[in-house]
Amino acid sequence: MSVAEYARDCAAQGLRGDYSVCRADFTVAQDYDYSDEEQAVWRTLCDRQTKLTRKLAHHSYLDGVEKLGLLDRIPDFEDVSTKLRKLTGWEIIAVPGLIPAAPFFDHLANRRFPVTNWLRTRQELDYIVEPDMFHDFFGHVPVLSQPVFADFMQMYGKKAGDIIALGGDEMITRLYWYTAEYGLVQEAGQPLKAFGAGLMSSFTELQFAVEGKDAHHVPFDLETVMRTGYEIDKFQRAYFVLPSFDALRDAFQTADFEAIVARRKDQKALDPATV
C-alpha cells in the first residue's frame, strides 16, 4: 500500500497524523518543536504513571527508563537512539501514527522501533483511541534496552511476514498483543510484574493487571497465546505470564509456526476468560 493510499484510509477512520510528509518507509522527521502545553502534558503523564511503574513494572523496564531518560521532557528521538544503540543496537524512528504491517515489521527486523511524533491532549490523559508518543515511547522503548527482549522483537519482525503468508495474520497479532502490549512476567521467587506497553501507559489497567483480584493470569504458552482473542477498548480478560524473557525468546525461536498455523488458523479464537 502506498503512503497516499494509507493516508486516505487513516483520514477516513478519523485517525490523526500528517502522512503527507511521510517517506516511502512511512517515517517522518520528529521536528522537535513541542509547545509548553505539550511538555506539561508529557510531565503530567510521566509523573502520574511512574508512581505506579516504580512498584508494578519489571526491573528491566525501570532500568531502561533510568538509562534512557524519558521523564523530564518530551524525548529527542535521536538522543535516545544514541543511548539505545549502545545498549542493544536498537534505534527510534518517528512516524505520523499507525503504519501498515509490512513496513512496521521491516523496521522491527532492522532494530528500528517506530514512535508516533505527536502527543495526546490534556483531555485524553486517561484514554486515547490510537497510539501516541506516550504509549509508544513511555510504554515500549524502555524494555528495548533489555537484550533478550530486544532480540525477541527483532525476531518477531523478521518472522511475522512469513507467518502472515501462511494465513496466520490474526495469530501473530495476538502474540504481539499479549507480550509487547500486555505482557506480565514472574521470575522464580519474585512478585508478578508488568512490561507490556499497553499496561505501562495505562494508569488504571496497570493496577488491575498486576494487583486486581479479578485479573485472570495465565501461564505463558506460545500456541495458546496465538489462539486467544483479545480486547481493544476495555481491560483484557486474560494476561499471560512469562517466567522470563528467555522463555519468550526461546519459545519463539523453536516454534514450528507452519505447523501451528496449519493446525489452528481455521479454528475459532479461544475465549480469554476461559483459557
Curated annotation (Swiss-Prot):
A Pfam family the protein falls into: Biopterin_H
What residues does Fe cation bind to?
H135, H140, E181
Top-level taxon of the source organism: Bacteria
Instruction: Show the InterPro entries listed in the entry.
Output: ArAA_hydroxylase, ArAA_hydroxylase_Fe/CU_BS, ArAA_hydroxylase_sf, Aro-AA_hydroxylase_C_sf, Aromatic-AA_hydroxylase_C, Phe-4-hydroxylase_mono
Q: Extract the signal peptide range.
A: none
User: Which UniProt keywords are listed?
Assistant: Iron, Metal-binding, Monooxygenase, Oxidoreductase, Phenylalanine catabolism
One annotated GO molecular function: iron ion binding
Q: What is its EC number?
A: 1.14.16.1
The answer, when asked if Cell inner membrane is one of the entry's keywords, is: no
Query: Where does this protein act, in terms of pathway?
Result: Amino-acid degradation; L-phenylalanine degradation; acetoacetate and fumarate from L-phenylalanine: step 1/6
Q: Which reaction does it catalyse?
A: (6R)-L-erythro-5,6,7,8-tetrahydrobiopterin + L-phenylalanine + O2 = (4aS,6R)-4a-hydroxy-L-erythro-5,6,7,8-tetrahydrobiopterin + L-tyrosine
Cofactor(s) the protein requires to work? Fe(2+)
Explain how, and how many, cofactor molecules are bound. Answer: Binds 1 Fe(2+) ion.
Q: Name one GO biological process term.
A: L-phenylalanine catabolic process
Q: Which family does it belong to?
A: Belongs to the biopterin-dependent aromatic amino acid hydroxylase family.
PANTHER family given for it? AROMATIC AMINO ACID HYDROXYLASE, PHENYLALANINE-4-HYDROXYLASE
* NCBIfam families named in the record: Phe4hydrox_mono (TIGR01267), PRK11913.1-2 (NF008877)
Protein name as catalogued: Phenylalanine-4-hydroxylase
